């Protein structure tokens, strides 16, 4: 389960776009094809709730598809990304006695960091960083290896013999594929790929930087010299 506050922030930001800036937001609508038609883009989409299909046109496209490739003819133009799985555990109440404080575990066995955070009366511990993951891109899940990794570090740093968790979840990071290093060393920064005229794709980045990414996307898309190298 994704933390509630992240969901609330995403919903609030979308509502602000609709109510304040007259945006039009659609959930559960999958874009299945994009084709260039003269100076516009023809977009085919399907409503995932009822199966209805739609066709509409756009002058400009900003694609922030995360781990998913662009559809149709543009799939081969998607920037290379590397998947990284990140699992978390939720512990009931405050078994580690952090007393409402966030704690950073400075060094894991694979030279990363982990965190322990209070969350709605419970405790979150995470996260892993692995190039393999269980489940699907749409529904990833924490596997036994992920859980054992987190529990092993809890026992080490908090000197406890038993760790019980109430739930777990996993997410997939879409990182820039540099072909050279493991996911733990890949930058969490974002960059823009010039897919076509007035069509850019965002790769990498983190949720915490979404406002900056949106600002830079619009500045780039509507600049007089729209070119990326």
Feature map (PLM): residue ranges:
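Short, conserved active-site loop motifs that form the nucleotide-linked donor/cofactor pocket
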Residues: 7, 23-24, 199
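Short, hydrophobic/aromatic-rich segments at coil-to-beta transitions
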Residues: 39-43, 99-100
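Core beta-strand elements of the Rossmann-like FAD/NAD(P) dinucleotide-binding domain
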Residues: 49-60
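C-terminal catalytic lobe of FAD-dependent flavoproteins
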Residues: 12, 17, 69, 73, ...
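Short, well-ordered coil/turn residues at beta-beta hairpins
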Residues: 62-65
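Single conserved hydrophobic/aromatic residue that forms the stacking wall/gate
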Residues: 1-11
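A conserved short coil-to-beta-strand element within the FAD-binding core of flavoproteins
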Residues: 27-41
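Short, surface-exposed charged micro-motifs
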Residues: 24, 33, 57, 113-115, ...
């Amino acid at each position: 389960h994704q933390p509630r506050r992240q969901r609330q922030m995403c919903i609030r930001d979308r509502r602000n776009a609709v109510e304040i800036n007259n945006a039009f937001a659609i959930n559960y609508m999958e874009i299945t094809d994009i084709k260039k038609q003269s100076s516009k883009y023809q977009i085919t989409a399907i409503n995932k709730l009822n199966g209805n299909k739609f066709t509409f046109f756009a002058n400009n496209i900003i694609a922030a598809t995360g781990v998913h490739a662009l559809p149709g003819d543009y799939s081969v133009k998607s920037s290379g990304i590397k998947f990284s799985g990140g699992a978390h555990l939720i512990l009931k109440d405050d078994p580690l006695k952090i007393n409402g404080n966030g704690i950073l575990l400075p060094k894991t066995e694979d030279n990363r960091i982990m965190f322990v955070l209070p969350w709605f009366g419970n405790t979150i511990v995470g996260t892993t960083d692995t190039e393999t993951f269980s489940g699907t891109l749409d529904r990833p899940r924490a596997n036994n290896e992920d859980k054992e990794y987190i529990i092993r570090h809890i026992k080490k740093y908090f000197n406890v013999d038993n760790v019980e968790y109430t739930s777990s979840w996993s997410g997939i990071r879409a990182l820039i594929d540099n072909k050279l290093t493991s996911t733990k060393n890949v930058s969490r920064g974002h960059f823009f790929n010039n897919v076509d005229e007035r069509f850019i794709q965002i790769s990498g980045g983190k949720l915490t930087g979404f406002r900056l990414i949106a600002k830079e996307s619009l500045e780039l898309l509507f600049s007089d010299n729209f070119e990326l190298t």
